[in-house]
Every structure is written in C-alpha cells, then in structure tokens.
C-alpha cells in the first residue's frame, strides 16, 4: 500500500502546525496535564512576561506527587509540599485552570484521573511535566513528558517544537498464561530490549496479548515505555477503548460521540506501513516477572535466579550488574523465591487502578500480612478509592493487615512522607527501582499487584502460579 502510515505517523501528521525547513516542526497540543511539582516556575514565567494561557479549557491540574496519603489536611504536608500545593491552587485560580485539589472527590495521580475522566482521548496529543505521561498512549494518543520550560511554552501557545521520532513495533504474540499480567508483559519487554532499547523511538504495542488487555492493562504497558528509553508508547484504539470512554465526563456525547468513534476507528497502523524497528515476543513464554537490580531492565522470571555477572560478556554491562548487586544486597545464584521483603507498596501511576486492586485483593483475602512486613495500598484516585470501597476491597486489605490510604503518588518516589528507610527491601508495583528511588538506601523490586500482595502475606517473593 502506498502512503501507508503507522498509528504514530497519523497522529503526528494531524497535529503539525508548522514545519519550517531545517527546523523542528511545531505541533499542536490537545490536552495539557499539570501538577504541583513541575509547574510553579512555568506559571511564574507567564506572570513575569504578562502572558495569559492560550487555552485554559485544555489545561487540567491536580495535586499528587507531594500530597499525604494519610490525611487530606494541608497540615499533614511538609513546608515545601504545602508551598507547592498552595502555589498550584493560586496559579490555577489566577489563570483559570480547572484544578482537582486534595479535597476534590476526583483528585488523584495525574495519569490515573486523566483517563478515567475522559480527558484522554484517541488521536490527541497530550503532554505533562512528568516522564510517565506515556501512560495515555494506551488510548491511541501521542503522550509524552516535557520539561518545565516546555510546560511554560505550552501554557502560553498550546504548541510545542518537537523532532519526529523513529517508529518501533513491539508485537506480543499469542496469549499469556494464568498469573501473568500486563506488568509482567512490559517488564519482560524491557528485560529483552534493555532500558535504552527504545531510545529515539515511539513504540506501538500490538499483538494478541496486547489486544486482550483491558484499558487498565494497556495503561500499565504504555506507562513503562519510558523505562525502555522510548519517547512514548501507543496502542491502537479499538472497541475496548470505546467502551471504556463511553459516558465519561470529558468524552464526546451524542452525535459527537458517534462522529468521534468513526474517526478513532481509522487511527490505526495501515497494512504495509513500515517501522524502523520491530521486536517480537511470545506471550506464552512470559512468566511473572521480578526485578533483581537497580533498573527495570534487570529483571528475571519468578522461577529464576539472581544472574551472575561473570556470565556477562559485555564489560560495561557486567560492571553495572556488579554495582547493582552490591547496592541491592543480593548474591548471584539466589533463587528469586528466597528473597525476603519487609515492605510492600501497591500503588503508583503504573498499578493503582481498580483492576490492579482487585488483582491484589485476591491474594490478600482471608490471609494476613506476614510478621515484620508493612504493606500499604494506595488507590490512584478518588474514583478508584470509592469504587474499591463499594466493592469491599478496602475491608479485604484492612482485615489482612494492609494499610488503606488516600490517593497520591505515595511511595513510588521519596518526595512525600511515604518512603523507605535505608536497608528496607520493598515489593513495589511502581515503575522505577533506581538507587534511592523510594528513599535513601532503599531496595526496590518491581512486581505486579498480585505478586506484591502475595509477597506481603508470605514475607518473601512467591510464584503465584503455585500454591503458597
């Protein structure tokens, strides 16, 4: 087929405002998501220059990174956190931006509340001053993180200069086996191509295993596209997408809905479209995954062992492995199921949606958190929290000894009062296991919600495909 285009190319082409020869094209931004950490300087820049927002109705703000998951009171925040949330509130008031503050029933992690409110739509360009903006690509949107200076530029112009990325197709063929989740799929992908395997690319995830995922699962996969170095991750919209969006607050209604769906159905990669790179995996080969090191690419199956750097031919990779093992406090050859933990975190923009909490609750129900283990469950938004409580999931967790918290980014990053102490070893459903990510000297192992809950009750990592 001549002129065949990929999903990314179609969305990109539809948003070019100007493409001066020899310069980066200018693209239009449909939705701009804002939070308290990366926006203060951007708003200050506008005030200094005397500029207004170009499109305040296309800008949506929430408080998530620094908020407390124990209390909705400003008094629960550190002085710096309080300054940031109060500054965001004032900036939103001054510039006419819709804000979901800590008292709003829909407040939550920006990448959880955006989709559930229908702010995220197929074929749109979405930006946010946050690296995990790729999450929204699950809807067939082109979504990526931007820096604070770019946040200011989008606020002022609703556009952005961007170089076009290369295209990569990651096809996960066939179907996963029981116990294998979207988190396991994306960790397996990162383990295969490495944390820089997607650098310079926008990745389209496809194949039967991806198509079979719910929207929550697709968001988990796209969320971690950045962890393989990609600019963004995308999944073509389909009936699963449309069913999820129907009736949501900011989704089209009535005749506009029918017209939108007709357009969205055309936003898919054409037959014969050429990708710059192709990666293929067999879903049946993917087992529950567990990171052993200090980046998401240092990952193995739960029935595996901590790898031995001596078997790595590349000197640079070998040195990285040795450094990771020293920090993480593990010995090569240790079975993954022999690794004990003392902390569990179920939450983050990767895995804090209702499907994630249901999955974790299956392993918590009728059990008790192991002695010496502290486990917290942090729903991704007010909507998720309310739905989970309506389903009785909170009671399952609380009766098992988990702490049930308020929405927020929480222990994903050591930016609020939920953090690990030096030497703590945590089973975490978040997206990064870097040195110190969850607190100075903390040791993080990335897993699915089901694996995290199972580790909480066992006191060590277990293969959830087997009795434990």
Swiss-Prot record:
Binds 1 [4Fe-4S] cluster per subunit. The keyword Iron applies. Its EC number is 4.2.1.33. It catalyses: (2R,3S)-3-isopropylmalate = (2S)-2-isopropylmalate. One of its GO terms (molecular function) is 3-isopropylmalate dehydratase activity. [4Fe-4S] cluster binds at residues 349, 409, 412. Disulfide bonds: none annotated. Pathway: Amino-acid biosynthesis; L-leucine biosynthesis; L-leucine from 3-methyl-2-oxobutanoate: step 2/4. It holds the Pfam family Aconitase. Its cofactor is [4Fe-4S] cluster. GO terms for biological process: L-leucine biosynthetic process. CDD domains: IPMI. Keywords: 4Fe-4S, Amino-acid biosynthesis, Branched-chain amino acid biosynthesis, Iron, Iron-sulfur, Leucine biosynthesis, Lyase, Metal-binding. Belongs to the aconitase/IPM isomerase family. LeuC type 1 subfamily. Heterodimer of LeuC and LeuD. HAMAP family: LeuC_type1. PANTHER family: 3-ISOPROPYLMALATE DEHYDRATASE (PTHR43822:SF9), HOMOACONITASE, MITOCHONDRIAL-RELATED (PTHR43822). Catalyzes the isomerization between 2-isopropylmalate and 3-isopropylmalate, via the formation of 2-isopropylmaleate. This is 3-isopropylmalate dehydratase large subunit.
